[in-house]
Amino acid sequence: MKKLLSIAILLLFINCNSVDLIDSWKNPEIEIFESTKILIVGMTSNIEARKKFERKLKQEYEARGVEAVMSLELFEPSFTSEKKSPQELKIIENILVSNGFNSVLFTKVIGVEDKIKYKENFDGYDATYRKFKDDYLKYQDIFYNPEYYDEYTIYHTETSLYCICQTKGRDLIWKGYLDISDPFSVENTVDQYVNLLLFVLEEQQLINPLLKKEKIKL
């Protein structure tokens, strides 16, 4: 019953927002994971969005008793836009481990898609008894009148949680695919994305619930 309730709440949460969870995967060998010190990385050229996103997640993790560090606090802003070799990333991982980090949360945009949504639904229209003239007149406005459709953009994103533990290896713990539909403000989108992400991570027992049930402001 508890699981069904959680699913119902999640569906309600998703349907009320412009951020949707499309799919996710959890390492079957890991039932529960607890970050003690986590690096938060948002890969985007939009520095404002990256800063808000990383700061919001940092605050949420800290509210749960986890030490969290933004990539913008540790590296130059150009860190995510410059190519890294496998050797360089290995060195970075070793530095993180030696400084007490045991996990990395990495979010990036993996695709962009332009969409068209028609405002009028023609599925129930009687297709049996109509003439060419009626058919043409009914559908012509779809193509010639912009008021009949909405154009919007979907950003396909991926968030991955990695363990960089000294004893457990450097393994992928969880991966989620989230779609952002036509974002109208950075702050609103960040709030929706982070809230949904945290909800899923809590359900998967990969992050502790809030110590205090209070809204965290940017």
Predicted regions, residues:
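N-terminal export/targeting and maturation segments
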Residues: N27-F53
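Residues that line or immediately flank small-molecule/substrate-binding pockets and catalytic motifs
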Residues: A8, K108-G111, I180
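N-terminal segment of the mature soluble domain
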Residues: S45-K115
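C-terminal motif of bacterial Sec signal peptides marking the signal peptidase cleavage site
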Residues: L12-N15
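C-terminal/domain-edge helix-coil "capping" segments
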Residues: N17-E34, D134-L218
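Sec-dependent signal peptide recognition
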Residues: K2-I7
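Surface-exposed short loop/turn segments
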Residues: Q87-S160
